[in-house]
Swiss-Prot record, chains A, B:
The keyword Oxidoreductase does not apply. It is an enzyme of class 2 (transferase). Optimum pH is 5.5. Its main location: cytoplasm. This is Acetyl-S-ACP:malonate ACP transferase. It comes from the Bacteria. Gene3D superfamilies: Glutaconate Coenzyme A-transferase (3.40.1080.10). It comes from Malonomonas rubra. It is found in: Cytoplasm.
Length: 554, 554
């Protein structure tokens, strides 16, 4: 027989750590903010796997500062597993040697710094994930030992109210606490009774009222004033040639001016095309201010959100038939569930990118920026586990020419995955390239694979100002490449197009120009937008939308 | 300007319904069980979308009986959205005209009845989903109006303890309650204070103590006494030729004797191959009793579970370093998160099927059974949104011959998706067929597509008693079909194999027989199993495993 085994090392260790922090508590689970650093130094060990909550919106910024102030002689070589690293402090923690390894999903403004630290050996990269994939690993091989989360309110028993910006908190807390880990929450306000229990108190070990409210980034706010005529044209093409053509009822919209334009075209051009009630009924979507006119015009039946959006809280609360509102009257977002909906329950993903290669692989990575792709790969892929049928999914599968080579005579649907991009971006950088810059990043950052946001075999349509390429209809890779060249304009890739070949593709409906789609270019301008400014959005909302100061110029 | 719009129809309607039920409550949120039918008649309206909790394990059976006892003159044409329909009452509800439409994931023992009702027009099928996909739609276009859920304990404020069998409850409750819906819970025991808050009281509208504990099915218990020598042989092949070959550390095991055999070979053959610490470290897995010897032998680092398994509760609680155990000392399962882990964080899915066609598409559907596939499509597919790299994923992608036709020169990994099946099943039904019976089901049940569990392009390996077919290594569909023929034995598909072609495939390592793998057939027998009976499993667990009576014969 084997020697007696110990099966509760984790809980014993947790108990020891919590005991070491005992005197830092002022009342039940409450720790005064001035004890924040001491608390982390008591419960964190060198080499620990640590989650620091923070996505592209809410940030456990006070706890991040506390972690950054820990003594790196004691606390070092941490393995950070966290959705995003958008704040300077996130990288400072590596700079100080407190953390060493990073598994994440989104770099945001710190993407260049991540690449720099990788080169300098200050940071070791685990992997770049899509959000839901990272959450998945919290229950597999990347469970956090200690998690630093954030909430609006907390009480002395640890109950948390995360409300509008619930975002990643439930999935982090559950994975950590149920593997004997330690969960520490910063809260904007310590209260006697939380407005609503979003996280049960038993899941939380310590609550700290932070000196100021957590940082929130209005990442999904696009000022209609900045939408260009070209974006209007492309939006009209997408609406008629894809949304209408496939009858897309359930979808996600990413960040960006292209989809903002589409949102603002629904009550105008969308109505003109007679599409209300036929498309855009259900969304997995952050509460985009540019959705207000379409919602007010009765287009939308439901929206489930990954996170909140600064300024949109009151508007969402006043539209409980549309958004997911709790019994207390405030919204609850949930990134894990919304990403799940985005993966399995939507018929289309549409968004922008930085570069598309001649095969149709696309990426926002550049040679010197470890950007990460957030939720895009999860929604911008063909969800192969999907089994339910919708008209648009079935239609795209039916026209997918290469399916027989994969499945024999077995039919299957296909999700619409659309990339919208002008052929040239600012500074005249071409969007279509022979080889993605991601290859150079892979070399520079010593990655196993070039970071691709959307792979060619998942991509079904490209929309540029030149036209739409219907890639699923192509026979084989060569034809797909020809279709891409056909909409790539004056880029190197586009210039290699054979006009005769493009003409044939147009005749077969694989490439469609605005004219092929019956769109009058002279109408494609900003006058088509249902709102032309942030002020228009506020008015349309009846004053419920409260834009952040940086968007207010009246 | 438009006329004044109403944006709170849902909450107004909910309030009206709850008011109608007002006098049925005895104390705060408590409704006596004899008022169960009256409660449902008060809060449910004809045509409602209703969730009735019940997966392949725990069942809200009392509430199902209550629903089945409602007056079909009042309550009819319900649209049921529920994970599974394994109980007779689930179909009775349709028989009585109370429900009309069904969206689900798993039929289990009622699969034939579902097909029958479809033919007779008693039931209209929305779609067959994989679990996570159905959950996804709860946040998109299939949000329940009323959900009938179940828990071990509930208190007067609606707080629920769902513990070991938390399973689907959190995702159902959140989707329903936050879209202004009504959540009714049956509990085994009404208590003053629940052991642990799994569902906050505010998410629950009514709690009913059911007359008897909810039904639990020990679906994942396999008696080692019933494992055959052939299953041992195939298990040895899989361990050496796939688990060991690819170094599979993170995985799921489905239901069945093939994977039960593998679990029981880890402490014997697995150790002999020197694989401990190199494979099978992290699982998304129900607490299979046949995992006990491998856990005790130190193979496993973590297991996150979809649900509980009858008899395994004490064992799991005594192994908190392995399972996900809460602060109260009891386990919390979670199907939504475990399926997410199964989709995005595992390197391999392995399981059995009923039929594989000549192209490699497989299904458990037959002409007269609407079976559904539970979690299999979610885990038995290539997760295209995945971006993190592991050795096994990278290796399978590198040997995937057809990748260049899809992606050009862009490399990508590939998940291992393995089907294990003897070439003939009981009654000598061939496992390999020209055309799946699923085609006939599609015709009989008027489905848009034949229900396929795993599509050919996701399948990477087939293991039969003849050998392993390494499908990802094949060049094109024709060669993949030849490899399938090469392991299909004396089935019609297998008999059409060209021996010369199979020989070439063996030389190229695309087909490997036990001899090619260096496995001595004479050793492939039950003596290799680490436990040969349920009694052995109990002993190995130190008496912690308490098997259900039907498995106890000593």
């Amino acid at each position: 027989m084997q020697k007696e085994k110990v099966w509760d090392k984790l809980s014993t260790d947790t108990e020891e750590r919590m005991n070491a922090a005992n005197e830092l508590f002022s009342d039940r689970k409450v720790v005064p903010s001035q004890n924040g650093v001491a608390l982390l130094e008591a419960v964190i060990r060198a080499g620990d796997r640590i989650n620091l909550e923070g996505n592209n919106q809410k940030q456990a910024d006070f706890l991040a500062e506390c972690l950054g102030s820990c003594d790196s002689e004691k606390i070092n070589n941490l393995h950070m597993v966290q959705s995003a690293v958008p704040l300077p402090i996130h990288l400072d923690i590596f700079d100080k040697g407190i953390a060493k390894k990073l598994d994440f999903a989104y770099g945001g403004p710190m993407a260049a710094k991540v690449a720099e630290f990788l080169r300098e050996g200050k940071l070791e990269l685990g992997a770049i994930h899509t959000y839901l994939e990272l959450f998945a690993r919290y229950f597999m091989d990347l469970t956090p030992r200690v998690s630093l989360i954030c909430a609006y309110e907390g009480d002395k028993d640890g109950n948390l109210y995360t409300g509008f910006n619930t975002e990643d908190t439930p999935v982090i807390a559950e994975a950590t606490k149920f593997r004997q880990g330690i969960v520490i929450a910063q809260v904007n306000k310590l209260v006697d009774k939380v407005q609503r229990v979003d996280i049960p108190g038993e899941w939380v070990d310590a609550v700290i009222e932070s000196p100021k409210p957590f940082y929130l980034e209005p990442l999904f706010t696009r000022d209609p004033a900045n939408i260009t005529d070209t974006q209007v044209l492309m939006g009209m093409m997408a609406l008629k040639g894809i949304y209408g053509e496939y009858g897309v009822q359930r979808l996600n919209h990413g960040i960006g001016f292209f989809t903002a334009a589409i949102e603002l075209l629904l009550p105008t051009y969308g109505n003109e095309l007679g599409l209300k009630g036929k498309i855009c009924k259900h969304f997995a979507l952050n509460p985009h201010p540019t959705m207000i006119p379409a919602i007010e015009d009765g287009w939308v039946e439901s929206i489930h959100s990954f996170g909140g959006e600064l300024g949109m809280q009151k508007y969402c609360e006043a539209r409980p038939d549309i958004f997911f509102i709790g019994p207390d009257g405030s919204m609850r977002s949930n990134r894990a569930y919304s990403q799940t909906a985005g993966h399995y329950a939507t018929d289309m993903f549409i968004g922008g990118t930085l570069q598309i290669d001649k095969y149709g692989n696309s990426s926002t990575a550049t040679a010197s920026r470890v950007a990460g792709f957030g939720g895009a790969p999860n929604m911008g892929c063909d969800a192969k586990g999907r089994r339910h049928v919708t008209d648009s999914w079935l239609k795209c599968g039916a026209e997918f020419e290469d399916q027989a080579a994969l499945l024999g005579d077995m039919p299957r649907g296909k999700r619409l995955v659309v990339q919208m991009q002008e052929t040239f971006k600012e500074k005249m950088d071409p969007s279509f390239v022979e080889k993605l810059d991601a290859w150079n990043l892979a070399k520079n950052a010593n990655l196993d694979l070039a970071p691709v946001m959307i792979y060619s075999d998942d991509l079904t349509h490209i929309v540029t100002e030149e036209g739409i390429a219907y890639l699923a209809k192509c026979r084989g890779l060569e034809e797909r490449m020809a279709a891409i060249r056909g909409v790539a304009g004056y880029t190197e890739v586009g210039l290699s197009a054979d006009p005769k070949e493009t003409k044939t593709l147009r005749e077969r409906g694989i490439v469609k120009t605005p004219e092929d789609l019956g769109i009058d270019r002279s109408r494609a301008n900003r006058s088509m937008l249902a709102a032309k400014s942030v002020k228009d959005l506020v008015d349309c909302s009846g004053g419920l939308y409260e834009p952040p100061a940086r968007f207010v110029n009246w």
